[in-house]
């Protein structure tokens, strides 16, 4: 098994942290997006979207998307439980996982895409969209601060993904 990784990616970082918290030893293969390594025929055969992270199993099966990779690793290595201990815990973890992706991560990625140098020749950048999205992200961060107030963890009583 090996993990194809883009070190600065928050999604790849989520998987690396998950692996570390599980105490797993999975070799990491860094992929350089800046040089187009993720667009080679070999990589696209593993993940047709060319994104990271990607977990390649020993039999050649490939799992993309950080949530799916974490789910697989949790099922194969249930201790310590990082996706919840029972049905209610798992539902709460899933709820917060989804909220973080939709309310914070995707908007932050949009800001990066519409302002980042590496994207200027790949997409039509709309700086005004980035400005408005930045305001929305700031509001969501304030919301998150209120949700975290007085809690050790956002998704229940135990440490989770």
Map each language-model feature to its residues:
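GST-like domain detector, emphasizing the conserved glutathione-binding G-site
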Residues: 1-131, 135-141
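Short histidine-centered beta-strand/loop micro-motifs
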Residues: 82-85, 153-157
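GST superfamily/GST-like fold recognition
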Residues: 108-109, 154-161
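Hydrophobic alpha-helical bundle segments that form small-molecule/ligand-binding pockets
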Residues: 143-155
């Amino acid at each position: 098994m090996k993990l194809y990784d883009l070190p600065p990616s928050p999604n790849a970082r989520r998987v690396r942290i998950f692996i570390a918290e599980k105490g797993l030893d999975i070799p990491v293969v860094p992929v350089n997006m800046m040089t187009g390594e993720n667009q080679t025929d070999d990589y696209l055969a593993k993940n047709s979207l060319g994104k990271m992270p990607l977990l390649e199993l020993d039999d050649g099966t490939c799992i993309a998307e950080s949530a799916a990779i974490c789910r697989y690793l949790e099922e194969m290595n249930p201790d310590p439980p990082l996706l919840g201990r029972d049905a209610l815990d798992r539902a709460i973890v899933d709820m917060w996982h989804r909220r973080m992706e939709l309310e914070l991560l995707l908007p932050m990625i949009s800001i990066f895409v519409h302002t980042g140098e590496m994207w200027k020749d790949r997409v039509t950048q709309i700086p005004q969209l980035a400005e408005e999205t930045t305001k929305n992200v700031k509001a969501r961060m304030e919301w998150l601060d209120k949700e975290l107030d007085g809690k050790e963890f956002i998704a229940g009583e135990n440490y989770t993904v």
